[in-house]
């Protein structure tokens, strides 16, 4: 479940920027 959170965070940050 931690991987999902990390992926979501990275995805949101990467996509946002």
From Swiss-Prot:
The keyword Transcription applies. GO terms for biological process: heterocyst development. It is found in: Periplasm. The keyword Phosphoprotein does not apply. Disruption phenotype: Forms multiple, contiguous heterocysts with abnormal short spacing between heterocysts on nitrogen-containing medium. These heterocysts do not have nitrogenase activity. In nitrogen-free medium nearly normal heterocyst patterns are established after 4 days growth. One of its GO terms (cellular component) is periplasmic space. Keywords: Heterocyst, Periplasm, Transcription, Transcription regulation. Induction: Transcribed at low levels in vegetative cells. Under control of HetR. Transcription and translation rises 3-fold by 6 hours after heterocyst induction by nitrogen reduction (before proheterocysts can be identified), descends to preinduction levels by 27 hours (at protein level). Changing residue 13 to C: Does not inhibit heterocyst formation. Inhibits heterocyst differentiation; a peptide corresponding to the last 5-6 amino acids blocks heterocyst formation when added exogenously in culture. Controls heterocyst pattern formation through intercellular signaling mechanisms. In Nostoc filaments, approximately every 10th vegetative cell terminally differentiates into a heterocyst specialized for nitrogen fixation. Seems to inhibit the formation of adjacent heterocysts. The C-terminal peptide binds HetR, inhibits hetR transcription and blocks the DNA-binding of HetR. The C-terminal peptide binds HetR; one peptide binds to each subunit of the HetR homodimer. This is Transcriptional regulator peptide PatS. It comes from Nostoc sp. (strain PCC 7120 / SAG 25.82 / UTEX 2576). The gene is patS.
């Amino acid at each position: 479940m931690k991987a999902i959170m990390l992926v979501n965070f990275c995805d949101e940050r990467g996509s946002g920027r």
